[in-house]
């Protein structure tokens, strides 16, 4: 199996840190891309924020080293005591790719068909300045099937309400961590990221669409290249890892 071990733990004021390892005792299932797929949990009985990052992977020892950092939301000291850290999933064997998608320029639709997305299907949204996407919930209707990476498909591109929309489909995000983003590359090499993005479930609730909105004119777009950055694939390992650790204020 795969063994979890807490190497050290520290509690100082409003912050707790755990240094832990995951070691594959049977094979080579772990690698430098592995993570807990948001399944990790350490409960304090108070509201906390946290993150878990992979520090390194030792292929000779078949061991991944992680650092988990937690902080109280109100800045108050976290309580002392014995606490249980648990995780149910590991995602490994992911691959990263950077792909020229300029062929999409041949498919830009100036009058695309639009679909309305029900609020309950919208997963979330984002923008560099934190502003909500305009016309969120109105997305392009899929018309393309261009797959730049396994499990990822570009499904539509077109201008609507003054913005360029590019739509991508991630086939099964409930069992993989497939994700990515597109950018426009100007002739001078300047990279232009999406001004807004929003995400919505497919009809089955297992795959997800990503709609990226760019503030650019058709004439400006004609001079650009399109590039995609993707993380795809991966093997999901399920288990029930649990360890109890004492934490005292240092």
Question: PLM ranges: what are they?
Answer:
Residues 1-250:
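Alpha-helical, hydrophobic structural elements that either
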């Amino acid at each position: 199996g795969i063994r979890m071990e807490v190497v050290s733990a520290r509690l100082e004021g409003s912050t707790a840190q755990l240094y832990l390892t995951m070691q594959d005792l049977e094979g080579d299932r772990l690698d430098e891309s592995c993570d807990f797929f948001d399944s990790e949990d350490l409960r304090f009985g108070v509201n906390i924020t946290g993150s878990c990052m992979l520090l390194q992977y030792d292929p000779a020892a078949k061991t991944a080293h992680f650092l988990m950092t937690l902080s109280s939301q109100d800045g108050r000291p976290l309580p002392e005591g014995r606490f249980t850290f648990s995780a149910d999933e590991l995602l490994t064997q992911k691959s990263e790719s950077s792909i020229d998608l300029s062929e999409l320029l041949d498919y830009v639709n100036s009058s695309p068909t639009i679909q309305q997305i029900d609020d309950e299907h919208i997963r979330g949204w984002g923008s560099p300045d934190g502003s909500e996407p305009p016309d969120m919930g109105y997305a392009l209707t899929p018309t393309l099937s261009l797959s730049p990476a396994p499990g990822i498909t570009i499904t539509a591109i077109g201008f609507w309400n003054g913005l360029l929309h590019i739509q991508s489909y991630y086939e099964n995000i409930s069992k993989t961590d497939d994700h990515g983003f597109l950018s426009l590359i100007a002739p001078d090499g300047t990279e232009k990221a999406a001004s807004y993005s929003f995400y919505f479930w497919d009809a089955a609730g297992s795959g997800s669409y990503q709609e990226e909105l760019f503030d650019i004119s058709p004439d400006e777009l004609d001079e650009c290249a399109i590039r995609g950055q993707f993380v795809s694939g991966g093997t999901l390992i399920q288990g029930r890892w649990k360890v109890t650790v004492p934490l005292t204020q240092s």
